[in-house]
Regions:
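Binuclear metal-dependent phosphoesterase catalytic core
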Residues: 40, 189-195, 211, 215, ...
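Core catalytic region of metal-dependent phosphoesterases/phosphodiesterases
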Residues: 44-193
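Binuclear metal-dependent hydrolase catalytic cores centered on His/Asp/Glu-rich metal-binding motifs
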Residues: 194-237, 257-258, 272-278
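Beta-strand-turn-beta hairpins that frame and shape the catalytic cleft
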Residues: 25-32, 189-200, 235-238, 306-313
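Active-site-proximal segments of metal-dependent phosphoesterases and phosphodiesterases across multiple
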Residues: 128-140, 238-290
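Active-site environment of divalent metal-dependent phosphoester hydrolases
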Residues: 39-43, 66-71, 162-173, 190, ...
Length: 345
């Protein structure tokens, strides 16, 4: 017997009342949007917030490496012009050109800073002053991001959980204070719905770049074990761990010679040598605990999905310099992932 659309809707409504009468939850799954490695890109951050509304998600997860890598001074030359050492050098005239460059710098994941010629000379003469200024601007920018996210997400009833990555300084991540709709999940276990707890870890195994939060495999293993030990229902666990598990196909990068600085690609037979840069400790943890999903990043060019046992591993990748937001929609239910989709926008 084929039911009309109206009768079908009435039946579904009655079934919902029946489930509530039995004390059964109406909600069968939670929709997550996950993106990572924004590296300070203002354009990607704007798209992340928009994705929460566009995809109608309940949970937003912002993975590690959220801060930028470079500070670009915009120098007032005192004659109505401005100069910036950015993409070959820029000479600007008028407020409109300056605003355009500010947007370009911010969208690409860098920070701009206005200064006079004399202040620029002081900065050139003191690495300590540059480092202090850079840290201040990183911190202020991230706090502004959180404020914007709270304002936007409060209208949707969506909660965003953010973590740092190995490229982010601990003191910058520690400066993020929880708001009603934005939570600093770094190195915590967070309950994201009635069924699921999420392990959040932003460290990485050692890299050739010697980043602020590179750690040994032993330290990674100890921290992961500490976090997982507090989970009550491990069959419904979600991992949000920045570095991918080793040799999973989502951690493939060119091998670098770190005996020189900056590190250089290793070539063999005229071709770059590729290898799995992921973590052995994280792979062991996934094999041992079998979370329903592992949300990772770190390796921008290894976008994709794979499985380790029952665990779905997702690396959405990153194209932040182009302002392209790579992400993943993940629908999780009781002890399983119901569906997932990689996104670009």
């Amino acid at each position: 017997m084929k039911l009309s659309r109206r009768k079908t809707l009435v039946l579904l409504h009655l079934l919902g009342d029946y489930r509530r009468w039995l004390g059964m939850p109406d909600k069968k799954f939670t929709k997550i949007f996950f993106a990572t490695d924004l590296h300070g890109s203002g354009k990607c951050f704007d798209k992340l917030l928009s994705a929460a509304k566009f995809y109608k998600v309940e949970v937003l997860v912002l993975g590690g490496d959220i801060t930028g890598k470079m500070l670009v001074p915009i120098v007032d030359m005192g004659d109505g012009s401005f100069k910036a050492d950015y993409i070959g050098g820029k000479t600007l005239h008028g407020a409109e050109e300056v605003k355009s460059l500010e947007r370009e710098i911010s969208d690409s994941g860098y920070y701009y800073y206005h200064c006079s010629k004399s202040e620029m000379e002081e900065l050139n003469a003191s690495k300590e002053k540059v480092d202090k200024l850079f840290m201040t601007i990183m911190k202020d920018t991230l706090i502004k991001w959180v404020d914007r996210a709270e304002t936007f997400l409060s209208q949707l009833g969506v909660t965003c959980y953010l973590t740092g990555g190995n490229d982010d300084y601990q003191e910058i991540i520690d400066a993020v204070r929880d708001t009603p709709h934005v939570k600093n999940a770094d190195h915590k276990v967070i309950k994201i719905d009635e069924l699921h707890e999420m392990v959040n870890l932003g460290w990485s195994n050692p890299t050739p770049w010697k980043c602020p939060r590179d750690h040994t495999e032993e330290e990674l293993e100890a921290m992961t074990e500490k976090l997982v030990s507090s989970i009550s229902d491990k069959e419904n666990c979600v991992f949000n761990i920045h570095v991918p598990p080793v040799d999973c196909g989502l951690d493939t990068v060119p091998k670098l010679d770190d005996s020189v600085y900056p590190p250089k690609p290793v070539f063999q037979g005229g071709q770059a040598v590729m290898f799995g840069a992921g973590s052995t400790a994280i792979r062991r943890a996934i094999e041992k605990y079998q979370p329903i999903v592992d949300l990772c990043g770190h390796v921008h060019e290894s976008r994709g999905t794979t499985r380790i046992g029952r665990t779905l591993v997702i690396n959405p990748g990153s194209d932040y310099p182009e302002g392209m937001l790579r992400g993943a929609i993940v629908n999780i239910g009781d002890k399983k992932v119901l569906s997932f989709q990689l996104t670009s926008g």
